[in-house]
C-alpha cells in the first residue's frame, strides 16, 4: 500500500514526470521529485533569426536577407564558412564583407541549406543584411526530477522556444542556476500568469545539455536541492490513472510545498501534441496564490 501511494505521487507529481521519463522507465527504477524553481540560461547553437527588417540606405529601403530567401525561425550557423555563435560574430562577418556577397549556412526545420546574401550599406555606413537575431535566453522553470544515481535531471516538460517565432531554441550550452520566487503574476481567464524569479549567475547548479519538445535535460553539479530528499518508484506511462494527486511546487521564496490536484485526463504516449496529462488544481491555497497552473511551475 505504501509503495502504491509513493508510485501514485511519483507519476502525478509535476504534471509530466512520467512522460518525461517514460522512454527510460525500463532502465530507471526510482527518481527524486523536486518541484523547486531554477534559473535557466541558454546559448544558442548559431544565431536565430527572429525578425526580417529593412535596411535604411541612402537610396531607400533594402531587404537583403528576405530577398535572398532567409526566413524568420532560421538559424544562421556560418557566414562564408566561418562559424558564428553570437550576434557579435555575425555582425563582424557582415562588416568584413565590405558589401560583397556572403554565403549563409542556415538550419531550417532540421535541414541545412545555403543562401547568398549581399549586405546593404545603411545611412550610417554600416553593412547590414536586415535581420533581428537572438543568440541566448534566460528565464525560470521548475526542476522536475533528478536521478540519484547519476545526477541527471529533467525539467519543464516542454521545450524552450523563442518567444517571437515559436522555434525550439537550438542549444549550444546552458546552465541551471539557483532561483527564488520573488512574486507571482496570477493566472486569469485567457492569461496564463507566471512565476517571477530572482537568480544570479554565480550560483550554478548544473548543466543544460538537451533542449527537446519534452523538456530540458542535463546533469546536476550541485546536490544542495536534493541531497536530503528521498527517491520514489518510477511508473510506466500506462500505469497513470485519473483521480486525486499531489504536486510539488515552489511559488514563494525557495519553499517547496505539496498541493492537491486532480488528474482529469491521461493522453496516450504518442499524442500528436506531446501532451502527457490534464490536471485541475483543487487546492484552495494554491488557487488563492496563483489562480492555478502558471508559467514557470
Question: What positions do the PLM features span?
Answer:
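Gram-positive cell-envelope targeting signals
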Residues: 1-32, 36-38, 143, 166
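PDZ-domain C-terminal substructure recognizer with occasional recognition of PDZ-binding tails
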Residues: 28, 36-38, 71, 91-130
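PDZ/PDZ-like groove recognition
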Residues: 36-71, 275-280, 285
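Conserved PDZ fold ligand-binding element
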Residues: 65-87, 297
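Hydrophobic beta-strand signal
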Residues: 76-78, 103, 246
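Short, surface-exposed secondary-structure boundary micro-motifs
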Residues: 81-82, 107, 250
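Short, Lys/Arg- and Gly-enriched loop/turn segments at beta-strand edges
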Residues: 82-93, 114, 256-258
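Serine endopeptidase catalytic core focused on the charge-relay Asp
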Residues: 121, 125-296
Amino acid at each position: 500500500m505504501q509503495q502504491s501511494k509513493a508510485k501514485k505521487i511519483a507519476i502525478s507529481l509535476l504534471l509530466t514526470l512520467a512522460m518525461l521519463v517514460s522512454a527510460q522507465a525500463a532502465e530507471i527504477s526510482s527518481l527524486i521529485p523536486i518541484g523547486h524553481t531554477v534559473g535557466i540560461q541558454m546559448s544558442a547553437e548559431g544565431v536565430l533569426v527572429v525578425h526580417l527588417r529593412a535596411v535604411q540606405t541612402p537610396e531607400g529601403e533594402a531587404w537583403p536577407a528576405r530577398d535572398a530567401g532567409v526566413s524568420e525561425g532560421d538559424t544562421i550557423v556560418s557566414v562564408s564558412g566561418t562559424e558564428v555563435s553570437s550576434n557579435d560574430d555575425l555582425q563582424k562577418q557582415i562588416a568584413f564583407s565590405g558589401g560583397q556577397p556572403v554565403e549563409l549556412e542556415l538550419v531550417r526545420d532540421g535541414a541545412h541549406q545555403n543562401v547568398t546574401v549581399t549586405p546593404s550599406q545603411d545611412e550610417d555606413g554600416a553593412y547590414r543584411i536586415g535581420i533581428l537575431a537572438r543568440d541566448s535566453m534566460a528565464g525560470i522553470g521548475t526542476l522536475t526530477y533528478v536521478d540519484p544515481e547519476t545526477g541527471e535531471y529533467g525539467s519543464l516538460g516542454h521545450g524552450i522556444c523563442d518567444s517571437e517565432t515559436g522555434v525550439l531554441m537550438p542549444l549550444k550550452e546552458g546552465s541551471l542556476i539557483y532561483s527564488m520566487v520573488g512574486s507571482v503574476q496570477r493566472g486569469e481567464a485567457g492569461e496564463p500568469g507566471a512565476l517571477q524569479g530572482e537568480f544570479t549567475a554565480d550560483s550554478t547548479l548544473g548543466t543544460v545539455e538537451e533542449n527537446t519538445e519534452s523538456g530540458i535535460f542535463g546533469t546536476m553539479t550541485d546536490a544542495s536541492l536534493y541531497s536530503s530528499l528521498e527517491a520514489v518508484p518510477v511508473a510506466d506511462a500506462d500505469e497513470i490513472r485519473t483521480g486525486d494527486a499531489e504536486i510539488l511546487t515552489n511559488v514563494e521564496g525557495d519553499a517547496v510545498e505539496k498541493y492537491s490536484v486532480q488528474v482529469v485526463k491521461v493522453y496516450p504516449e504518442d499524442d500528436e501534441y506531446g501532451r502527457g496529462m490534464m490536471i485541475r488544481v483543487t487546492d484552495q491555497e494554491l488557487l488563492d496564490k496563483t489562480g492555478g497552473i502558471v508559467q514557470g511551475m
